[in-house]
Amino acid sequence: KFIIQNRTPFMQSFLYWANVSVHANNDYQVQFPPNTVYGTSHSKTQYTNWPVTAVGDQELDTSWWKNWKGSNSTFAVNYSDDFLSGYDFGADAGTIHFANHHVVPGKKFFLWGTESVWNEMLTEEDGAYLELMVGTYSDNQPDYSWIGPNEVRSTTQYWYPIKGIGGAKEATLEAAVNLERISPSSMMVGFNVTEKYNNARVLVKEGDKVLYEGRTDIAPDTFWKKE
């Protein structure tokens, strides 16, 4: 929980971004919510397509850590979703951030670079890392917000782990869900939850058509996946 109080009789500026570092490697992907189609830079001076965009003379999927050579900050142009995720496909595990997007609109990732020198300088023998970042009352840096005299503001944010489902297309405080097209006639659906559910109903629909319906027990230390 984040609480900020202005104890002065004057209007004050503030900037707050939460920063979680995660292990990064060639299997790591940043997953902005699916309806994110643009990214932007600091101060919103440049915009790019997301996730596939031009890097030099190549078209690259820049959601993957391996496709960056130098340092980079990318902010999601997204003002409607409450979550951000990142996933290590080698470890088959990842991280979800969840918060009210009206209060925590900022979604960003930062990396120093993918060369080995950064490992030596920053983590010694612990490997590369990437920063998942979220902004409270701010969607960019340095995009300051303002707080009035004697005003108090607060917000609550949540981070939780996911595994076994290949990332997330949607997430709430209770669960993360992934949906992937495997072939023209098949798909994968997977869930992680943040509390235990017994005999939970799983329903997958396309419009009014029921594609799958079943029951399962699921808890935070397990996952559900069906192809």
Where are these regions (language model features)?
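Beta-strand-rich binding/interaction modules
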Residues: 186-215
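Asparagine-centered strand-capping/turn motif at beta-strand->loop junctions
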Residues: 3-9, 191-193
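Short coil/turn motifs at secondary-structure junctions
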Residues: 6-9, 162-163, 207
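Short Pro-Gly-centered flexible turn/kink motifs
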Residues: 2, 145-162
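Short, hydrophobic/aromatic beta-strand segments
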Residues: 9-16, 168-169, 199-203
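A contiguous, surface-exposed recognition patch within enzymatic or periplasmic domains that forms
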Residues: 7-152
